[in-house]
Amino acid sequence: MIKARIWSGALALVALVSLPLQAAEPVKVGSKIDTEGALLGNIILQVLESHGVKTVNKIQLGTTPVVRGAITAGELDIYPEYTGNGAFFFKDENDPAWKNAQQGYEKVKTLDAQKNKLIWLTPAPANNTWTIAVRQDLAEKNHLTSLADLSAWLQKGGDFKLAASAEFIERPDALPAFEKAYGFKLKQSQLLSLAGAIRR
């Protein structure tokens, strides 16, 4: 597997400060469109329901911008999020705090409380680091052990197709960051954008 650390981010839950765990007010539980988001969202949903809390299922609502917009607009009460995304929520990508999970958590927790009245709950011991993986046979045949090797191989015309989420293809801290850092550019024909795709 070829991988590089771009942003550090612990998994935390974002909840509206006014989250009313009252039977009369169902808790609107959301998640992102990806499989991981759906799994985490369903865990939240089941935990709340097992404690007698009424819920509204908004699992797999959309991409990060869609879900973020929903919680800031009051359309969601809770969803799982990675602290590193705070860099983009607050247009503060160059702050070194985002490269440290604990510092990033403290920063986004403070900013969201002040600016959006959102509360970040205690983070889970999880990490969401963007990576690019290649098949073992491709790596062995072409001597690919790093992203620098992959870049050099691509620049020589290596036959490559990347399957990735729309977010990985679009977000500035994902594929565009890899392309910039390692000096390669994938053509549209080399990209297979998974569910919820936004073509570039």
Sequence positions of predicted segments:
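Ligand-binding cleft/hinge of the Venus flytrap
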Residues: 44-52, 147-187
